[in-house]
Regions:
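Negatively charged
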Residues: 1-299
């Protein structure tokens, strides 16, 4: 087994990387035996080829860098499949399961419209913004990898699959310990998404589901929302403009703190096919006029 990212294609494709190479160590190979240092120059692969890329970057990809220096792949040509463990870019010998720095893989495949298959993302200990925008704009992406972490980090999955218009099924999301903005806009504008993940967490964090399924126009059924402890803006605009959504989840909130802000703000605005209107608990109604709140915010 070769510990590296593996790239294949259906026709001639050029793969390169933009961003700052300073402090990074990456190698490439066409046979998994003969390795050469990669200086981000263009690498060509044909239908019968496999390109391998690996690294030794124990401090992570984007540690201490400005956003305009973050590294990201570029692909031009045919459709591209990417296999292998993403952590082979961090330490191909040991394959750690800990993300070593904040924003580590930020935008790594952003706008790679040729990418159809995502690599494995096995890390169980995440870092702030580690997968933010990672596959944003990957309009050909149809297959994602598992996301096994059960404890999340601030904005770790935010905008991760934004605009992945070919994605029909979301990966499982087993996390029970959330973080601020962890799922913010994760699937926004995934217009083909039909199968949504279960969301098992019972205690929410500020903006955790903010715009999570915004404009997912193929989604017909929302996931169950079992949370009993909410947070500021936790569900804000979560299903906004999900024009095919027919069934809304129950909102079984048992604990609401006085002063809680925007937890259901705009949650179902623009859901023009909705057949059942969500109902809030009596404890919530007692804190404001429910009808007014629904008209102005929830629906």
């Amino acid at each position: 087994m070769i510990n590296a990212l593996k790239f294949t294609t259906n026709s001639k494709t050029i793969i390169s990387m933009k961003g700052s190479k300073t402090g990074l160590s990456l190698e490439y190979s066409y046979d998994g035996i003969d390795w050469k240092e990669w200086d981000f120059n263009s690498l060509s692969i044909n239908k019968s080829d496999t390109l391998y890329i690996r690294g030794n970057n124990p401090n992570g990809f984007n540690r201490g860098r400005a956003v305009d220096e973050y590294c990201s792949f570029e692909m031009n040509g045919g459709k591209v499949r990417c296999y292998g463990n993403i952590m082979s870019l961090i330490d191909y010998k040991n394959l750690p399961n800990i993300i070593p720095c904040e924003y580590c893989f930020y935008g790594l495949f952003k706008d790679c419209t040729a990418l159809t298959t995502a690599p494995e993302l096995p890390a169980t200990k995440l870092a702030k913004g580690c997968y933010r925008f990672m596959f944003s704009g990957c309009t050909s992406l149809t297959t994602t990898s598992e996301l096994p972490a059960t404890e999340l980090a601030t904005e770790c999955y935010s905008w991760m699959f934004y605009g992945c218009t070919s994605l029909t099924m979301a990966p499982e999301l087993p996390a029970t310990k959330l973080a601020k903005g962890c799922y913010c806009s994760m699937f926004e504008k995934c217009t083909s998404l039909k199968i949504e993940p279960a969301l098992p967490a019972t205690t929410l964090k500020d903006s955790c589901y903010y715009r999570m399924f915004f404009n997912c126009t193929s989604l017909t059924v929302a996931p169950e929302l079992p949370a009993t402890k909410l947070a500021n803006w936790c569900y804000s605009y979560m299903f906004k403009k999900c024009t095919s959504l027919k069934i809304a989840p129950e909102l079984p909130t048992a604990e609401l703190t006085i002063g809680l802000r925007g937890c259901y703000d705009g949650m179902f605005i623009g859901c023009t096919s909705l057949k059942n209107k969500p109902e809030l608990t009596e404890s919530y109604k007692s804190r404001m006029t429910f009808k007014e709140y629904c008209q102005r915010h929830v629906l």
